[in-house]
Amino acid sequence: MTIATGAAVASNYYPQPLLDSIATDLGVSYAAVGIIVTVSQVGYGVGLMFLVPLGDKFEKRRLIVLMMALTAAGLLISGLAPSLPWLLLGTAMTGLFSAVTQVLVPFAALMAPVNAKGRAVGMLMSGLLIGILLGRTVSGGLSSLGSWRIVYFVAAAVLILLAVMLWRSLPTHRSETRIIYNELIGSVVRLFKTEPILRQRALLGFLSFVLFALFWTPLAFLLSQPPYQYSEAVIGLFGLAGIAGALAANWAGRMTDRGKNREATLISLVLLLVAWLPLGLGKTSLAALIIGVIVLDLAAQLLHVSNMGAVMRINPELRNRLNSGYMTVYFLGGASGSFAAATIYQYFGWDGIVTAGVLVALVGLVFGGRAVYRTRAGG
């Protein structure tokens, strides 16, 4: 399940090291090609809102395998795309059905013992982050063997293989919920009205993913220009610098199980601000850029798992819907950050990205610091 989670979410991040090549091949601007990242995040957010709650209604194994197969179909459309609109169509389809990751996470929590649910979530969150980061690395490496299109074809084949493996290995599980679909979706919206912890954690998740996307979306542009002028394969290797964040996922899961969620949240909010200090020097310093990547990814993952731990404890019977609500807002943050990053970099360069990052991180620290002490979010 961890591997499937990573492979599915990676589908949304393969384009990032390839943006410069895609822009050149399709004859579009940086701002236009940056829409690819935005569309993938919006598609993922729509899937989280309208598809993930189905895990509380339908048999989970069948739903997971179907969504994996449709994600692969979206990748094939992208790989065959003759123009940007076709690529955006394939990207939207991939993003929509790759939300299967958030059917897998509550399923893992459901199957885990009571005293190990935080670790189970942390394990799949590790797979999620590794997929996001290594997706860039694999993408850059594969593209060096040929066209950027080969990345999409290989990724589609991997997802089909994983879908077959999940069908053979996962247990069947049908929810006892008999609620109709419209009421199911409406209940997700109502949870935001009735659960203050969900509102607070969703906003923190939104801000953290804005920061994550602000950095990663324009990184390929920065590294493909002087003084770096790196190839796609080298740009993809920067995903390895963020692997430290995967370690934070297990650590955060264990802190949640020990009732230290609030401490993990505050540490992550401080680190999200601190990360932009070395990143501010990244325009000319490779060492500073790498340090900033490590701190930013670690902090973002630590906060994400802390948020998930708090949200999952609200009501065990509503895990899929709580997860759907939180993750929808979370990935809307990614879409907003991606859209803003492409535009900011186009007109203000790396200095504009860093300024925006510092401002968003300050908002998160002020809001989050007040919120976690006003509620017993993670206990």
Regions found by a protein language model. Name each.
Residues V46-L84:
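Conserved MFS/SLC helix-loop-helix module at the cytosolic interface between two early adjacent transmembrane helices
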Residues R62-L76, E263-P278, V358:
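Structural signature of the two symmetry-related core transmembrane helices
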Residues R262-N307:
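C-terminal transmembrane helical hairpin of 12-TM major facilitator-type secondary transporters
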Residues P171-L203:
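Juxtamembrane intracellular "pre-TM" segments in multi-pass secondary transporters
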Residues W86, M123-R168:
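Helix-loop-helix hairpin linking two adjacent transmembrane segments in secondary transporters
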Residues L48-E59, L247-N261, Y345:
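Helix-to-loop junctions at the C-terminal end of transmembrane segments
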Residues V100-A112, L302-N315:
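Intracellular juxtamembrane helix-capping segments at the cytosolic ends
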Residues G90-G127:
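Cytoplasmic helix-loop-helix junction between adjacent transmembrane helices
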